[in-house]
Regions:
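C-terminal motif of bacterial Sec signal peptides marking the signal peptidase cleavage site
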Residues: 16-19
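Hinge/lid segment of periplasmic solute-binding proteins
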Residues: 125-144, 150
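N-terminal secretory/targeting leader peptides
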Residues: 21-120, 140-141, 146-341
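Positively charged n-region of N-terminal signal peptides that target proteins for export
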Residues: 1-9
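Enrichment for repetitive, rod-forming helical segments
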Residues: 9-10, 268
Length: 341
């Protein structure tokens, strides 16, 4: 009888310990609950932005101890490679994070001002200061997204089928496809050129059949879209700094813990730095391809020529000042060291 009682007591103890162990395992599982984040972008795998996002996902997993998992939807998988669609998906919360273009709204017209930024480095540096943070704050106010970082792409260049662009007068009478942005349309008018807003999907055919004489984009876009097949002249004008925004849906952001937010912010800044290092390599490779492999006729503006363009563009800045807001334009002029003179 004593042996039976001892056996029963031992069995009870074993079962109790097993139950405690199961409770501990459940508690451990709860502590390691994974937050999944859907991140979308429209860039192909070989681009700096795409590589940067892969590095971002790895860094987040490492710093969160595997408790934050980034699922990447690249190459326009969710948007049909339409950046405006990506932005709308982010605003609505159908995706959690994304690389998106700057909004085509009043204050953000600043970044479409021609010949405002001299180069990528000075533009990126200004974005890391108070002026850059001011714009990220405005992003949430009007778009329901939280801006985490600026992702540099490159300065933009012109192509056309007529002649090199070396002075403002060289643009007179030419028609250029531009983004449907008020500042760009005003600029073309000021330089006596024709602005023809159209989608990227329409552009190649329009260049081929002469609907427009030229277009402007970063060199990597010119390469990837094969515009060299239908354009003879490449002018390195460095007239506008192209960049993207790394952003997160505001409602989703507010549900995260402070620790999770800090991890994502930190990793976003690191991704931005990675992309800044990669972007010049991509740009240089595109230049080599377009000029040395495909034989486009290239000219690069000298400092003197660039300043001539900047002087001619300042009436556009002044015309857009009321739209952008003097409270936005002035801090940015100070940040990049430009004046009205």
């Amino acid at each position: 009888m004593k042996k039976v009682l001892a056996f029963v007591l031992a069995l009870v103890m074993v079962l109790s310990m097993a139950a405690c162990g199961n409770d501990a395992n459940k508690q451990g599982d709860a502590e390691k609950e994974v937050t999944k984040i859907r991140l979308a972008h429209d860039y192909s795998p070989e681009t700096a932005n795409s590589i940067g996002m892969e590095n971002f996902a790895k860094l987040v997993a490492e710093k969160s101890g595997g408790t934050i998992e980034i699922d990447i939807y690249s190459n326009g998988e969710l948007s049909g490679r339409n950046s405006q669609t990506t932005f709308k998906l982010l605003q609505s919360g159908d995706i959690d994070m994304a690389i998106v273009p700057p909004p085509n709204t009043d204050a953000w017209q600043l970044f479409y001002q021609p010949f405002f930024f001299r180069d990528s480095d000075s533009a990126y540096a200004a974005c890391q200061g108070e002026a850059g943070q001011m714009m990220l704050d405005k992003l949430r106010d009007s778009n329901n997204v939280v801006g985490l970082a600026y992702l540099p792409i490159a300065m933009r260049a012109f192509t056309n089928s007529k002649h090199p662009i070396q002075a403002p007068a060289d643009m007179e009478g030419l028609s250029f496809r531009v983004l449907d942005v008020p500042t760009l349309v005003a600029w073309m008018k000021e330089f006596k050129a024709s602005a023809v807003p159209m989608s990227m999907a329409e552009l190649y055919m329009s260049l081929q059949n002469g609907t427009v004489d030229g277009q402007e984009n970063p060199l990597d876009t010119i390469k990837n879209q094969a515009f060299y097949e239908v354009q003879e002249y490449l002018s390195i004008t460095n007239h506008i700094w192209s960049f993207s925004l790394f952003a997160v849906n505001a409602d989703f952001w507010d549900k995260l813990t402070t620790e999770q937010q800090d991890i994502l912010k930190e990793c976003a800044v690191e991704a931005s730095k990675d992309i800044k290092e990669l972007a010049p390599e991509v740009n240089d490779a595109a230049y080599d391809f377009l000029v040395n492999e495909k034989g486009m006729k290239v000219n690069t503006l000298t400092d003197e020529q660039w300043l001539e363009f900047q002087k001619a563009a300042k009436p556009v800045w002044k015309a857009m000042e009321a739209t952008i807001g003097a409270d936005v334009l002035k801090p940015w002029m100070d940040a990049v060291g430009v004046t009205w003179d």
